[in-house]
A protein has these predicted regions:
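NAD(P)-dependent Rossmann-like dehydrogenase/reductase catalytic/cofactor-binding core
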Residues: 193, 197-255
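NAD(P)+-binding Rossmann beta1-loop-alpha1 motif at the extreme N-terminus of oxidoreductases
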Residues: 1-51, 55-59, 178-181
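Short, hydrophobic beta-strand segments that form beta-sheet elements in well-ordered domains
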Residues: 28-32, 65, 87-90, 124-128
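Rossmann-fold NAD(P) dinucleotide-binding segment
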Residues: 48, 52-103
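Small-residue helix-packing motif on alpha-helices
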Residues: 28, 38, 56, 72, ...
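Short, polar loop motifs at secondary-structure junctions
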Residues: 32-37, 93-95, 129-132
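Internal alpha-helical scaffold of NAD(P)-dependent oxidoreductase catalytic cores
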Residues: 98-107, 122-206, 247-255
Length: 255
C-alpha cells in the first residue's frame, strides 16, 4: 500500500516506523513538514519525500493526516482533493463531520493509537470501519478495532490513557520486588510485563469468560492470588480507576 503523509507528527512517525518493521511494510510519501523527523525517516526503506502537501496528494490517493487539530484548517487550505482520496486522520478530538467538511470531497476515516504503535503487535482504532484499511494494518501485524459510534471511538482513546496509568502501577510493583528480593529493576519490569502479556492472552483467547471469572479461576481459594484479590477488593482498589474513567467519559460526552 502507498500512503501519503500530510504532517509528520510524533504519532505519524511512530506509525511509519512500526509498519516498516513489519512483514508487510508500506510505501510512504511524506510532506516536507517537520524536516528533522522527515530526514530521519528517509533512512528507512520505502520512504520518499514530496515537494509540498499538494505533491503528496497528487501522488497518493490514501493520505495520513498527522498534524495537530489547530493546524487542520491551514492544511485543508493547502491541498485540493478529489472523491478518490481517502484521508486517515490522527488529529484527536475533531469530529468526523468537521473533517468531512474541511477535506471535502475526500472520504475520511478517523484513527487513533498510542506511541506503542511504533512496534508491530500494538493496536490501531478506526471510525468508521473500513475493510481495506483494517486488512492492511492487520497484515502489518497490528490489532485493529473499529467502532459503531463516534462516542465509542472517542472512548477508545481512554484505553491509551489506561496504558499510562498501568505503567505507573508497574513501577511501584517493580520497585517493591527490587527492595524485597534484590532483583534488578529491568528484571522486575520484564517479569511484570510478561504477567500482563499473559493476562492479555487469556482475555483474547477466552472472550466468553469475563475478566473477573478468569481472575478467580487463577486465584483459587487459599492461594496467594486469592489473598491478593480479596485484599484489593476489600480496599476498593478499582475505585480511583473507575472514578477518573467516569469523569473523563462524562467530559467526552459534553464536548
Amino acid at each position: 500500500m502507498r500512503l501519503g503523509v500530510l504532517g509528520v507528527g510524533a504519532l505519524a512517525e511512530a506509525l511509519i516506523r512500526g509498519v516498516q518493521q513489519s512483514d508487510c511494510p508500506f510505501e510512504w510519501c511524506l510532506s516536507p513538514r517537520s524536516a528533522e523527523r522527515v530526514a530521519q525517516l528517509q533512512a528507512l526503506p520505502g520512504i520518499s519525500v514530496a515537494a509540498d502537501n499538494q505533491a503528496v496528494a497528487d501522488q497518493c490517493d490514501m493520505l495520513l493526516v498527522g498534524v495537530r487539530p489547530q493546524q487542520l484548517e491551514q492544511l485543508a487550505a493547502s491541498v485540493q482533493l478529489t472523491p478518490e482520496h481517502h484521508l486517515i486522520c490522527l488529529s484527536a478530538g475533531v469530529e468526523l463531520q468537521t473533517l468531512q467538511q474541511a477535506f471535502h470531497p475526500a472520504r475520511v476515516t478517523r484513527m487513533t493509537a498510542s506511541i506503542a504503535v511504533a512496534y508491530p503487535g500494538s493496536s490501531v482504532f478506526l471510525y468508521p470501519a473500513d475493510t481495506e484499511l483494517s486488512a492492511k494494518f492487520t497484515a502489518a501485524g497490528y490489532g485493529v478495532q473499529s467502532f459503531a459510534t463516534e462516542l465509542q471511538f472517542e472512548a477508545s482513546m481512554l484505553s491509551v490513557c489506561v496504558n499510562a496509568w498501568w505503567l505507573e502501577q508497574v513501577q511501584a510493583l517493580a520497585e517493591t520486588l527490587v527492595e524485597q528480593t534484590g532483583m534488578r529493576l529491568p528484571e522486575a519490569v520484564a517479569l511484570l510485563a510478561r504477567a500482563q502479556q499473559e493476562s492479555a492472552v487469556l482475555l483474547q483467547q477466552r472472550p466468553e469468560s469475563t475478566p473477573t471469572a478468569l481472575a478467580r479461576e487463577i486465584g483459587t481459594p487459599g492461594t496467594f492470588t486469592a489473598r491478593g484479590l480479596d485484599h484489593l477488593k476489600a480496599n476498593q482498589a478499582e475505585r480511583p480507576w473507575v472514578e477518573i474513567l467516569n469523569q473523563l467519559l462524562t467530559e467526552l460526552k459534553r464536548s
